[in-house]
Amino acid sequence: MTGISFHLSPSEAATRSAAASFAQNVLRPSRATYLSHSSHPARFQATRPTYATAVSSSLIKSQLSPALGGTGGSLVEAALLVEECYAVEPSAALTIFATGLGLTPLNIAGDPAHAEFLAPFLSGEGAPLASLVFSEPGGVANALEKGGAGFQTTARREGDEWVVDGEKMWATNCAGWDFKGCELACVVCRDVTDGEEYGGDPRDKVMIVLVTRGDLERNGEGSFEVVRHVEMPGHSSVSGPHVRYNRVRVPAKNVLCPPGQGAQVAFGSFDASAVLVGAMGVGVMRAAFDAALAFAKRDARGGAVPLLERQAFADLLSGIKMQAEAARALTWKAAHALENGPGDYDARRELALAAKIYSSEAAVKACTDAINAVGVTAYDLDQPFSDLLNTAIVLPIFDGGNVGIRRRHMQELMLSPTYDAWASTFGPSK
């Protein structure tokens, strides 16, 4: 995608076509399989064959940059992939994309020296999971506030090793398929080598430590445990449990980001994922629109004409369509701008934040509008609407909640003395 054109390039069109095929032929059938299980953990484990197909189809390798041996393309292509998958089967898709988020810190800060950590994800074999282990049971929205408690998961230097201690929650894939740890966890933690008390900028102490499944096995039983599996109303095959690291020792080479660099890389990872959450929202809106449109064409609710000829129904449906188109345009623009500009990084980042906030909140409204249009029939579980709503309601509150994190980051940008409001569209004003 270049200039102002919205025509997909041959590469982008091929990505979309391949994604649509994968969604229909691999993701869609997985739903019936995992829904046959009653517990959340069992549903997650039931998606392993689907995930393995994603691995063998290079969907995991494609989430790593070419500089690291991957086949990753542009962020616009990633957004196209995410939309196609979320329009069909969000839950099984999220496990795939969460590994991409787990690998993003390495895309930002990794180098060839990290080849051993990346090898499982480049092989095209098995079902390796990665996770960005960020959130904590008590929340982290204000973890960088001076004078606050900060991240409660800590790392302490002891000789040639770092010792990781603490509890995390909501980190998709972090427990692995057998709940004994994933192949690679990028654990965001606070350096306490010089003690718990620190009066400076909390960012100075934030670091990212790589914890592999091999590290956990070397540390022995009890070093990693699942405290509780979280049952969720949507994304019902996704695993993001409450976990605990108990004095997990890793070698110094496992430090991806030393103290002082971890926050920038962690939030940089979430800048990229913000765009993809925008695409998730578009996928959900698209599914809601398509389902409501199909209903309106075949059902008259006892009247003489199909519902689509009723003004009230058409108004709600056209609203969903307009919001979906607007959200997609913003998402594509944010994806292109984050990698290409114009504007400095803050200007480009603002668009990513806007795409996440607008699209995620619009997706919730689109689902409720579709439900209101269809009426009580939408409450039937044989209809897709309740599941779509349960999928949508997490989009504004995960991957950095809109209220506690994403809007606050936009506020910080606007408060900056160097804020240049339209630089991401027209370039720097000066």
Q: What do the predicted segments below correspond to?
A:
Residues 52-119, 123-127, 178-182, 338, ...:
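Internal helix-loop-helix
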Residues 8, 224-325:
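Glycine-rich beta->alpha junctions and the first turn(s) of the following alpha-helix
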Residues 169-176, 273-277, 394-401:
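Glycine-rich phosphate/pyrophosphate-binding beta-alpha loops
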Residues 1-95, 419-430:
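Amphipathic, small/basic residue-rich leader segments at the start of a protein or domain
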Residues 374-430:
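Glycine-rich phosphate/cofactor-binding loops in nucleotide/flavin-utilizing enzymes
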Residues 28-41, 297, 301, 324-358, ...:
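C-terminal helix-coil-helix/basic helical segment that borders enzyme active sites and/or dimer interfaces
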Residues 167-224:
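A short core secondary-structure module
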Residues 125-139, 188:
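A short, Trp-centered hydrophobic/proline-enriched beta-strand micro-motif
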